[in-house]
Amino acid sequence: MSLSPGTRLGPYEIVEPIGSGGMGDVYRARDTRLERDVAVKVLPERVARDAEARMRFEREAKAVAALTHPNILAIHDYGSEGGSAFSVTELLEGETLRRRINAGAMPWRKAAEIGAAIADGLAAAHAKGIIHRDLKPENIFLTTDGRVKILDFGIAQLVRADPPPPSDTDPTALPTAPMKTDPGSVIGTAGYMAPEQLR
């Protein structure tokens, strides 16, 4: 389902489409409360209709929102409106790592800088018990001002089963159970999976 300019999802007014993929359609939108531009991802209708999938989406949104890190796309909000489930993130300008790779070789130093930034972001996620599960060039974004952002934790897995002991409680820790994947199912992009995911 595509949204027309001017469509409202709560306080967010759709401006124009900026991308689409298996995890939903992405739009440039205006936050009418805070008067800022944002990106709104509208999830596929099957997610919006499925109560369990919607709860999983909300859990993931909360998990990623706890990851305040310069190399992870910031989530501002999530919700549902008129049968559409959506998330709201910071709006980025630039290109994906896939597009940059397709444009030709880059200097080794630049490639190393990008790799280090990705590793920093993943380390922050892993410290909170979150595994991305679909890391690939299409999910890495290079902004026009030189930042590296990891996108689309939409199939992330929460691996921390129990909250930390009270003495070690981190106010941003995730007191949530692990996400469940159906037995025998494979999640991610085959060419970028770790071997143990394919077993």
Q: Where is each model-derived feature located?
A:
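Conserved ATP-binding/catalytic core of the eukaryotic-like protein kinase fold
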Residues: M1-R199
